[in-house]
């Protein structure tokens, strides 16, 4: 599992061009209906989702086998977590987790 940094971008098409043409990333997945793209360059992976950019910038995206069990485990340990969200069309489940300084990390499970 490779960590992926996700950015919310206002214009997915412009951002896709920037990462491919300007920074040399290769796009390995895109969903025009859900408005997201996944790109990689070497060991670096970047995900782009169309939406309003977040105040805190990028989100570290970490793949896990079972988001629901991770949510239960982390809550039991007293870690601040959000709610498990299933992406429409059953593509993946995500969970926002916060480190001791309030930095957001997103756990994700492909379905």
Feature locations, PLM:
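Short aromatic/hydrophobic contact patches that present stacked aromatics
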Residues: 4-6, 38, 45, 58-61, ...
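Mid-chain, well-packed structural core segment of small domains
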Residues: 60-74, 85
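N-terminal beta-strand motif that seeds the catalytic metal site of vicinal oxygen chelate
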Residues: 1-16, 58-60, 111
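Conserved short beta-strand elements that form part of the metal-binding/catalytic scaffold
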Residues: 26-58, 104-109
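Vicinal oxygen chelate
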Residues: 28, 75-111
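Short glycine-enriched loop/turn motifs at secondary-structure junctions
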Residues: 1, 52-57, 88-89
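Conserved active-site tyrosine of GNAT-family acetyltransferases
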Residues: 15-22, 74, 102
């Amino acid at each position: 599992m490779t960590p992926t940094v996700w950015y919310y971008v206002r214009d997915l098409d412009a951002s896709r061009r920037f990462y491919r043409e300007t920074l040399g990333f290769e796009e390995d997945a895109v969903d025009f209906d859900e408005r997201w793209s996944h790109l990689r360059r070497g060991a670096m992976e970047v995900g782009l989702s169309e939406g309003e950019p977040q105040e805190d910038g990028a989100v570290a995206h970490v793949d896990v086998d079972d988001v629901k069990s991770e949510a239960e485990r982390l809550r039991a340990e007293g870690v601040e977590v959000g709610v498990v969200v299933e992406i429409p069309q059953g593509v993946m489940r995500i969970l926002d987790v916060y480190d001791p300084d309030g930095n957001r990390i997103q756990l994700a499970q492909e379905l």
